[in-house]
Swiss-Prot record:
Segments for region (Interaction with PAX3): 593-737, 738-826
Source organism (scientific name): Mus musculus
Reported consequences of knocking out the gene: Embryonic stem cells (ES cells) exhibit accelerated differentiation in the early stages which may be attributable to increased availability of soluble histones.
Matches recorded under SMART domains: WD40
Official protein name in the record: Protein HIRA
Region of interest (Interaction with histone H2B), ranges: 594-824
Interaction with CCNA1: annotated span: 421-727
Stretches for region Required for repression of histone gene transcription: 439-475
WD repeat copies, ranges: 11-53, 68-107, 129-168, 172-211, 220-263, 266-322, 326-367
Length: 1015
């Protein structure tokens, strides 16, 4: 054995409370007290192991120093993969660190340039839950969980896959919890506290397995820490600071029955730390000796307040070695090297010691295969870690389930290979740019600073920012919901490169996440992801959502009509006996202002309507003044016969102003009985002529000419329709105020509240419909005709079936605010009217329930906090367009989401995500949008699978499956919005098959579908 105390490992005379060696053995970390804060230092292991490296000045001894903790650091622990370092301190925080590959060293802050950080480590997550000092942290096998204990008497289990999610808070101790340890087979976690107890908790349900108190009855809270340890074979748990006949011991607790019949004795003061060697040993065979197999044994190091260290072998009754007065103060922590032959010990006196053993002294270490066989023979399975998405001990009972699991593993392997290629490509690019190294570029930048001289001759130098270039593997955020799959754990164990598959600090879309199964999501407005863009996107004239490429395309086009601006609605109080405002005759100056306003609005409309190839047509009829009197302005000349010009065919019909002839009809409407606060919508006035292009059929044009003089002197209005060169025309006795068309019908609204409907060949389908009040907006989609009147009543008819869909429904219930206006109108292909209001809310009318339903809200906090990027199957699946996507108009709310998710607890985020996805499914169902319903249902089910919500998932499967056997009394419907429910269930099965936890549900649904198929 060799003993070394490297004096250069220190915290400037301050105490060192913790030490831990990196799994690859190249570095080690110390944690303790700094000058004015807690200090975490990462040291090079090579100068400790090799004397030549210690003397070589070119080999750095200190790699990095982090002073982020506000108070003393009590514990530092490397993850088993070596990718992360966790530190806990008196500031009640746990910080998780990850290396950042910077170019070149940097100096330690406050060291006046004397200390340099060779490696750069950044804090990727700060875990806040404890209300007192954090005394110990411990990573579980395979890094699935991180446990922390505190003087607040609790143990917190963190989900290391999705920081900062808390899986459980273990409450049961009545004193300061000062030590933690996981058993090597992942079934228990043990904690020791000042309440004179050691408690063992089950990881299956995070409940108490046993509480051991007898060996600690005589103990007092005299130690700073109580670091207990579990043997690598899982047979023994050794505690710190127990008492036997008033003498300090380290109590040995047998896993079988939790018996306390043995202990390590000999120390004169309380035991502070116990640490088992990670290796299992067997006796070294000497030359010529018998080949009889030896019994495996373990090695354990014990540190005490008496400043001595003892090393024990479980095959010996006495310690292998005892070193007295190794330090000036109490021993605080112990760490073994991964090969099991070296040990680092730290003390409160601020120094560390390294002991180097030989195989002749300890024995031959067993291989990992032999160690795994010992676990299997004793416990059946090794490392039986159970998380939400990984059940290593579960047996796959269904061949279809096995097929899905293998497919998922192959996809993860492909993603890993692609990521490896991208990383190698990026490293080659960042290392050399155009044949010049980054270091040379950095030096040349100093020579290229910009220098100018002012008029008075003084020099002005523009400084250049020469920042460190980070080439590390950085993710965008720390929130994600990627479950740790069974194949993922195996990959992490098999190769170091698999470490990148553990997304500790990766985010998570609603919506591109750095996870194995999700590609970066493109920003396209055709994607109904619940994300949001700027407020102007909702009111844009063009709608990119309709023209974006999509895998889940809708067979029919939606025709939203952006019909109202901020001056849409007017509220007036009816004053009995007072003269009507409509009787006021405007002056010539006012008439001129009206004409100028018309010209200005027309020019704006022409500029905003330049794209004639949109799938979604938005028409914006504007009320030209807040005055109720609107005069006719002769601004549109009589159109020539034949095909209209391009600029005229795009001219919105809604730019007309009201004529004096229409005042009588408006006055008639205002004379109707109304409440004290009446809602009045603008009325379009007749034009001499106008042309309208039908948005659903670009080859279809509607031309209207009012007051056409005939031979008898009778004035008529002419309606023309041109479709693919085929033209028809008809005449009407009243002047046409507005017109609309679709691929199925053409309708016009005339004076005297008349609405006429024609087929696309010019045949009148219905006698003129008398509207309850003058028309305000007219719109057609397919066979559906929607009329919105000046009295704010809405009607929708199916003219082919000649039935009413919505009958004179009032908008008063949704326009409740004094300044509320309608900013956009939609009529879906199923005749569902949708109103977008100025406050960002959108309501659709449900004909079945005769209610207005809220389907979108731009200020919805659920959409801002929802995070379901882990549930996105692919980039293409997000390109789902439809009425819901057009209404919501969201493509990316990552900015608002990122700002909120850092302050939103994961439990709240999980609940808001569920609520948001359920709202999306319900909204798509109400809008009868089959493609969007399928999209959001699959997304919702995938999130339930990832988060482990079995009850809700089972309810969905039950509804989609329906009764297996025929029943006359069953009310179950086999379709939903035109989709067969059992076909949807078949699409859900591969999603359910990704989580072994739901294999029973998968098998049940699969078997019942097979029974139905055989029938």
């Amino acid at each position: 054995m060799k003993l070394l105390k490297p004096t250069w490992v220190n915290h400037n005379g301050k105490p060192i409370f913790s030490v831990d060696i990196h799994p690859d053995g190249t570095k080690f970390a110390t944690g303790g007290q700094g000058q004015d804060s807690g200090k975490v230092v990462i040291w090079n292991m090579s100068p400790v192991l090799q004397e030549d490296d210690e003397k070589d000045e070119n080999i750095p001894k200190m790699l990095c120093q982090m002073d982020n903790h506000l108070a003393c650091v009590n514990c530092v622990r490397w993850s088993n993969s070596g990718m992360y370092l966790a530190s806990g301190g008196d500031d009640k925080l746990i910080m998780v660190w990850k290396r950042a590959t910077y170019i070149g060293p940097s100096t330690v802050f406050g060291s006046s340039g004397k200390l340099a950080n060779v490696e750069q480590w950044r804090c990727v997550s700060i875990l806040r839950s404890h209300s007192g000092d954090v005394m110990d942290v411990a990573w579980s096998p395979h890094d699935a969980w991180l446990a922390s204990c505190s003087v607040d008497n609790t143990v917190v289990i963190w989900n290391a896959v999705k920081f900062p999610e808390i899986l459980a808070t273990l409450r049961g101790h009545s004193g300061l919890v000062k030590g933690l340890t996981w058993d090597p087979v992942g079934k228990y976690i043990a904690s020791q506290a000042d309440d004179r107890s050691l408690k063992v908790w089950r990881t299956l349900d995070w409940q108490l397995e046993t509480s051991i108190t007898k060996p600690f009855d005589e103990c007092g809270g005299t130690t700073h820490v109580l670091r207990l340890s579990w043997s690598p074979d899982g047979h023994y748990l050794v505690s710190a600071h127990a008492m036997n006949n008033s003498g300090p011991t380290a109590q040995i607790i047998e896993r079988e029955g939790w018996k306390t019949n043995m202990d390590f004795v000999g120390h004169r003061k309380a035991v502070t730390v116990v640490k088992f060697n990670p290796k299992i040993f067997k006796k070294k065979q000497k030359n010529g000796s018998s080949t009889k197999p030896s019994c495996p044994y373990c090695c354990c190091a014990v540190g005490s307040k008496d400043r001595s260290l003892s090393v024990w072998l479980t095959c010996l009754k006495r310690p292998l070695v005892v070193i007295h007065e190794l330090f000036d103060k109490s021993i605080m922590d112990i760490s073994w090297t991964l090969n099991g032959l070296g040990i680092l010990v730290c003390s409160m006196d601020g120094s560390v010691a390294f002991l180097d053993f030989s195989q002749d002294e300890l024995g031959d270490p067993l291989s990992e295969e032999e160690k795994s066989r010992i676990h299997q023979s004793t416990y059946g399975k090794s490392l039986a870690i159970m998380t939400e998405a990984q059940l290593s001990t579960a047996v796959i009972e269904n061949p279809e389930m096995l097929k899905y699991q293998r497919r998922q593993q192959q996809q993860q392997l492909d993603q890993k290979n692609a990521t490896t290629r991208e990383t190698s490509s990026a490293s080659s690019v960042t290392g050399v740019v155009n044949g010049e190294s980054l270091e040379d570029i950095r030096k040349n930048l100093l020579k290229k600073q910009v220098e100018t001289r002012t008029a008075d001759g003084r020099r002005r130098i523009t400084p250049l920012c020469i920042a460190q270039l980070d080439t590390g593997d950085f993710s965008t955020a720390f929130f994600n919901s990627i479950p740790l799959s069974s194949s993922l754990a195996g990959t992490m164990l098999s190769s170091p490169s698999g470490q990148q598959l553990l997304p500790l600090d990766s985010s998570t879309p609603s919506f591109g996440a750095s996870k194995p199964c999700t590609e970066p999501v493109a920003a396209t407005s055709a994607r109904p992801t619940g994300e949001s863009v700027s407020k102007d996107s909702m009111n844009a004239t063009s709608t990119p959502a309709a023209s974006s490429p999509s895998v889940l395309t809708t067979p029919s086009k939606i025709e939203p009509m952006k019909a109202f601006d901020s001056r849409f609605t007017e509220r007036s109080k009816a004053t009995p006996g007072a003269p009507s405002l409509t009787s006021v005759i405007p002056t010539a100056v006012e008439r001129l202002k009206e004409q100028n306003l018309v010209k200005e609005l027309r020019s704006r409309e022409l500029e905003s309507s330049s794209d004639s190839d949109e799938k979604v047509h938005l028409a914006k009829p504007s009320s030209l003044s807040k005055r109720k009197l609107e005069l006719e302005v002769e601004t549109v000349e009589k159109k020539k016969k034949g095909r209209p010009r391009k600029d005229s065919r795009l001219l919105p019909m809604s730019l007309s102003v009201q004529s004096p002839a229409a005042l009588s009809t408006e006055k008639e409407a205002m004379c109707l009985s109304a409440p004290a606060l009446a809602l009045k919508l603008p009325i379009p006035g007749p034009q001499r002529a106008f042309t309208l292009q039908v948005s659903s059929d670009p080859s279809m044009y509607i031309e209207v000419e009012n007051e056409v003089t005939t031979v008898g002197g009778i004035r008529l209005s002419r309606l023309k329709c041109n479709r693919e060169g085929k033209e028809w025309e008809t005449v009407l006795s009243s002047r046409v105020l507005t017109a609309a068309g679709s691929c199925d019908v053409v309708c016009v609204a005339c004076e005297k509240r008349m609405l006429s409907v024609f087929s696309t060949c010019g045949r009148r389908l219905l006698p003129p419909i008398l509207l309850p009040s003058p028309i305000s907006t007219l719109h057609c989609t397919g066979p559906y005709v929607m009329a919105l009147t000046a009295a704010a009543t809405l009607s929708v008819w199916d003219v082919h079936r000649q039935v009413v869909v919505v009958k004179e429904e009032s908008l008063h219930s949704i326009l409740s605010g004094s300044d509320m206006t309608v900013s956009q109108i939609l009529l879906t292909q199923h005749g569902i009217p949708v109103m977008n209001l100025s406050d960002g809310k959108a309501y659709c009318f449900n004909p079945s329930l005769s209610t207005w339903n809220l389907v979108s809200d731009k200020q919805d906090s659920l959409a801002q906090c929802a995070d379901f990027r882990n549930s996105l199957p692919s980039q293409d699946a997000m390109l789902c367009s439809g009425p819901l996507a057009i209404i919501q108009g969201r493509t990316s709310n990552s900015g608002r989401q990122a700002a909120r998710l850092f302050s939103v607890p994961h439990v709240v985020q999980q609940e808001t995500t569920l609520a948001y996805l359920e709202n999306q499914v319900a909204a798509a169902l109400t809008l009868q949008s089959s493609h969007e319903y399928r999209h959001w249902l699959l997304l919702y089910a995938r999130y339930l699978v990832n988060e482990g919500f079995e009850y809700r998932l089972r309810e969905i499967c039950k509804d989609l499956l329906g009764p297996v056997h025929c029943s006359t009394g069953s009310q179950w419907e086999s379709t939903v919005v035109g989709l067969r429910k059992r076909e949807l269930l078949k699409e859900l099965l591969p999603v359910i098959g990704q989580n072994l936890r739901f294999q029973r549900l998968f098998t049940e649904c699969q078997e019942q579908l097979d029974i139905l198929r055989d029938k």
